[in-house]
């Protein structure tokens, strides 16, 4: 299966399935001499892992990461870093009844069309469980970006269903189970989730991720534009059906005089572009949003077919998230970090000696 690797100089390759023995990844391109321990990776894994809230799947995986290679005496060696997380709470029997049935809205049908077979246990390779390794790899990138360049990457939920959320307090994000930055909406989110669990249904969400302190000049013309690579990375996350950079689709209703980010001697006067012009970072905050569909793993009956072409009624059993967008926040942060680290290394490799007299803010 191709398509398991992202990045050029900072490269992340993941492997593993939802109900396999383990998940793993190989991280190439990490510079030597960076202090790194398993504890550095565990914080973000704990933010993503299942079973930590009554609002997410009750599959209880500790997601304890092991560093297998690339670190000696507490620092990176510059060689490939191997990471592994063992699966410990698989309940494959939950899926035995659907081994011949295509769950509507899932990858069951398309995987079988492509490969002629599929791992029906929890979706196999198509499961969001795979993203645990992205978060582990992304934690390496976040540490490097923060310590070497002062870059901070933060994400939060900015909409669930028809409930929009304002970014009022970043410190609140880690203090509630929704990654919600809006203290006035937490009760409404709680009420919605309770209703969904009672109905056996699910809901979509919007996640916003912001990178601060990114230097100007990252990104490559034409096909490796920074925003193109960010969109690619975020779109690769399970259930994501749309990505916006900056004002995104809202620019359709704006005029050029409103949308252009004017510059004065004091700096940029707005950031409609999300910190990227011509595919290259401007030094402003990089802002991206992603829309996640409601999961199709619900107990509301739905129509589908089996592999013999017969129509059947489908009710999903097992342990699932009523809103997959909640746990997507640390995944979005990880993917943005991976892209930024890759482009920083590429910029240093080609343009390390470039200096300009143009102001930077």
UniProtKB/Swiss-Prot annotation:
NADP(+) binds at residues 48, 54. SUPFAM superfamilies: Chorismate synthase, AroC. This is Chorismate synthase. Belongs to the chorismate synthase family. It catalyses: 5-O-(1-carboxyvinyl)-3-phosphoshikimate = chorismate + phosphate. Its cofactor is FMNH2. FMN binds at residues 125-127, 238-239, 278, 293-297, 319. The gene is aroC. GO terms for biological process: amino acid biosynthetic process; aromatic amino acid family biosynthetic process; chorismate biosynthetic process. The lineage of its organism: Bacteria, Pseudomonadati, Pseudomonadota, Gammaproteobacteria, Enterobacterales.
